[in-house]
C-alpha cells in the first residue's frame, strides 16, 4: 500500500493556486476603484468643508473669533428673509416632488406598462436643461409677451413678466422649475423600485379584494419608503443650495427680486461684493448644519439604513 510522502523541512513551497491569486488581484482592483471616490471626496468634499469651517471661526487676519462670524450674519437683516424664502420653496417643492413622482411612477407601473420605456425616455429629457439653461427657458415661458402659453398666463391675471415673478410667487415659480428639471430621473428610479416588489405580494392583495388605490397605499408605497427617504434627502440638499434661478431672475427683473433672495445669494454677496469670505463661510456652515440635521431626521424616522426591513 502506497504511503503519501511527508513534507520535509526546507522543501519548496507549493505554488499558490491560480484561483486564490485571481481573487486577491480582484480585491486589489476593487480597492483601486473605490480609492478614486475617496480621493475626490477628500479634495472636493471634506477638504473644502474643513477650510470653510476654519474661515467661519476666524477673521480676515487668521485670528480665531469663535462664533463671532455666526453671530454677525445672524444679525444681518437679510439673513432670516433669505432662509424663510428657501424654507417656503422647500415645502412646496418637496411636497409636489413626493406626490407627483410616486403618483406618476405608480401610474406607469400599473396602467402604462407597454408605453413605459418610451415614457421613461421622455422623463429624462427635461434634465438635459439644468441650471442656467433651464432658468432661461422658463424666463421665456413666463413672459406673457413672448410665451407660447401666454393665453394661460393672461387667464391667471399675469399681464407682464413682472406680474409673473412677483416676490410672493417666486417660491412656486422656482418649485415648478425644480420639478421640471429634477423629477424625471426620480420617476424612473421609483419605477425601477416598483419593479422590484415581488409579484406575489401584489397578487395576494388582489386576491384579498384590495383595490388599486389600497394596493398602492398599503403595499407599494410602504415598500418605497426608503427610496422616498433617499429622494427627500437629496432634494432637500439641492433645494437649500438654490442660487442660479433667483440670481438670473433677479437680474432680469431690474431690481424687483432681491439680490439676496436665497442664503447662497447672501453668501455670494458677502464673498464677492463685500470681500468678506469669513461671513460667507458662516452662512455656508449654517446651510451644512441644516442639511445634516434634516438628513439625520429623515434617516432615523424612515429607517433608511436598517437591514431586512
Model region roles, listed by residue range:
Residues 1-25:
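Short, Lys/Arg-rich, polar N-terminal cytosolic tail immediately upstream
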